[in-house]
């Protein structure tokens, strides 16, 4: 799936990926997709919870070694 915005949070640790993801989502229009990459061990669960709390949809989660990439659709 194509993303409308890409956010690279590799090398950043909690809570920085959450703050940056929240700001990036706020910049999107409803229906647009954000691609977030991170290597913080807590990032996958933290970003899933953030999306759920804000009412957005996690479309896909991809793991490659220590890095996780999530596609989040803004509602």
Question: In which residue ranges do the predicted regions lie?
Answer:
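Short amphipathic
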Residues: 3-10, 35
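Amphipathic, hydrophobic secondary-structure cores in small proteins
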Residues: 15-59
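A short acidic, often aromatic-flanked loop/helix-cap motif at beta-alpha or helix-coil junctions
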Residues: 14, 67
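Core SAM-dependent methyltransferase catalytic element
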Residues: 69-75
């Amino acid at each position: 799936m194509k993303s409308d915005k890409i956010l690279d949070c590799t090398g950043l640790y909690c809570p920085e990926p959450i703050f940056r993801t929240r700001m990036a989502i706020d910049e999107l229009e409803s229906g647009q997709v954000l691609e977030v990459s991170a290597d913080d061990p807590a990032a996958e669960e933290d970003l899933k919870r953030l999306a759920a709390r804000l009412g957005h949809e996690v479309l896909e989660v991809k793991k490659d070694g220590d890095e996780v990439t999530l596609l989040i659709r803004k509602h």
